[in-house]
């Protein structure tokens, strides 16, 4: 599974990203994480100081999924959103981005 952020909107802010109980770390603009996962349903969550958003993504054996995390306009601080995207869109964003440092 690839989780990425590509927009320059809100570039001064990073957003925290987690998959289930696993905290991956922060995504800045044009960065991505790649994680190996077992087939099942995963709760993907992004968090900013003002809000959070989550989506459930089901992954079958052998599938590669792409999930975009995006900054959205907030009242005082930015908000975030996560959503699955088509493989073509996800691959093109990952190719031009940089791998983010995952928290261990």
Predicted features, each with a name:
Residues 1-104:
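Short loop/turn and low-complexity linker motifs enriched in small/turn-promoting residues
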